[in-house]
Amino acid sequence: IVYGFLQFDRSVGQTKQTLFTLGLMLLFLIPKFLIVVPLLLEDFYRLGKGIFNYVQHKPTPTFLPERRRFISQVALGLAAIPFGSLIYGMTKGKYNFKVIKQTVFFDDLPEAFNGFKIIQISDVHSGSFDNKEKIEYAIDLINQQEADMMLFTGDIVNSLASEMHPWIDTFRKIKSFSYGKYAVLGNHDYGEYLDWKGNKNAKAQNFEEIKQLYG
């Protein structure tokens, strides 16, 4: 983890190495936090009880009562939940594509829009991809919806237009829609999370290339 952070360079952007390092850090810290909190609360209780026994002159083998095994087991159980979830998210979860269907009703909706279907996708973050087969499955899933219109609501990359280059041919397999495809830029598409070392021309060129990806 330390090596990963030492190697982090904002001028390079979010590489697979930096994302992996971030995942390891969360994997290390979040479960540890869930272990520490209940144990720390129990320690406050033990300290209070120890002080109470001391003030009351109650004879005890030790000043602090022994830690209860049940509390330790509960803490470990709590820590196992995010640990398992993070492992799943880092390996399988990012490709767990799902279709969520939502029927929208409007009293004043023209009859011509009855049954009109819009498919909306978002936050592709192509720089995080490493499995072509899974992405092709996602494209097939989009095409299977038989929608009338497609909306893409931003973040096609993490920062750099080049992140999308290996996936352009795959995304071109998205079929045409009767009422077209529409998109807006996301916050990551502006390249603001990258250190451009003051090179405004490179930043502007990258932004133009990202806009062309949307074309």
Q: What are these model-predicted stretches?
A:
Residues 12, 16, 58, 85-92, ...:
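Short, flexible coil/linker segments at or flanking structured domains
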Residues 7, 14-17, 56, 73, ...:
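Residue-identity detector for glutamine
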Residues 25, 74, 103-108, 125:
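Short, well-ordered turn and helix-capping elements at secondary-structure junctions
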Residues 1-95:
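Non-catalytic terminal accessory segments
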Residues 2-5, 59-62, 90-99, 122-130, ...:
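Short, mixed-charge, low-aromatic patches
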